[in-house]
């Protein structure tokens, strides 16, 4: 919103799920994507909101975001036979926004290697779109069918890591990521394909093709924990978020 800012008024806290910077001339504190030395800012990337940290029961009447329990995310179990049985399709892409590197990359991978199932508004080729907003339960169920998902952000900033990388993880689908160059501080680089590392689309496509065609390499990547050392990043721990609230916002 746009409530008038005043140092004498109640504490104003900025939060965004978009790639925007907090303006501390307009707010007292911020939960943002930013890595910052400013003590008024806490890095709270959007992917954090898509884990069920407290085992809240699922509400079938809502297309809610927190569908996957933290316990299941950490206790990653790979059933190779089930993977072979269910993941018979190569790759999917789900987006309706024609913005960023993905606009060029998706057609290249589709035309130069293998067809991609596009289930959003952009490049749609499945004769329909996913139910709901296409970014929660229906999306995750759809992802179960695929080995890979193109998980490109629509824009890039050092800390801007959204739900795009974590949704395929919920389905044991390998993300093909592009966006934040610091994404490996949030997630284990051995568990996904980091498109930021490759200077051009051709090299990235070669890497994808290699993993897709080598089952041992593919399974090895699937067996990696999603988090580095299978440990929750410090900034993502609920107790540290609450500590910021208590010691900064509520002080």
Segments (PLM) and residue ranges:
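Pol beta-like nucleotidyltransferase catalytic core
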Residues: 1-8, 13, 24-118, 122-154, ...
């Amino acid at each position: 919103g746009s409530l008038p800012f005043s140092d004498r008024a109640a504490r104003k806290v900025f939060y965004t799920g978009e790639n925007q910077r907090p303006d501390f001339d307009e707010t007292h504190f911020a939960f943002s994507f930013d890595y910052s030395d400013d003590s008024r800012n806490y890095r709270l990337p959007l992917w954090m909101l898509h884990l069920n940290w407290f085992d809240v029961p699922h509400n079938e009447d809502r297309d809610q975001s927190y569908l996957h329990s933290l316990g299941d995310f950490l206790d990653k179990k790979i059933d190779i036979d089930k993977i072979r049985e269910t993941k018979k399709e190569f790759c999917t892409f789900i987006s309706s926004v024609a913005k960023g590197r993905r606009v060029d990359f998706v057609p290249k991978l589709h035309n130069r290697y293998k067809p991609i199932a596009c289930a959003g508004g952009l490049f749609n080729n499945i004769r329909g779109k996913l139910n709901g907003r296409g970014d929660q339960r229906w999306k995750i169920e759809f992802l179960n069918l695929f080995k890979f998902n193109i998980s490109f952000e629509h824009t890039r900033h050092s800390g801007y890591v959204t739900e795009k990388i974590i949704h395929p993880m919920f389905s044991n689908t390998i993300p093909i990521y592009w966006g934040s160059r610091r994404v490996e501080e949030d997630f284990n680089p051995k568990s996904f394909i980091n498109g930021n590392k490759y200077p051009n689309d051709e090299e990235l496509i070669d890497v994808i093709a290699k993993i897709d065609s080598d089952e041992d390499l593919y399974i090895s990547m699937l067996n990696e924990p999603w988090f580095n050392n299978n440990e929750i990043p410090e900034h993502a721990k609920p107790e540290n978020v609450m500590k910021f609230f208590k010691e900064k916002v509520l002080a």
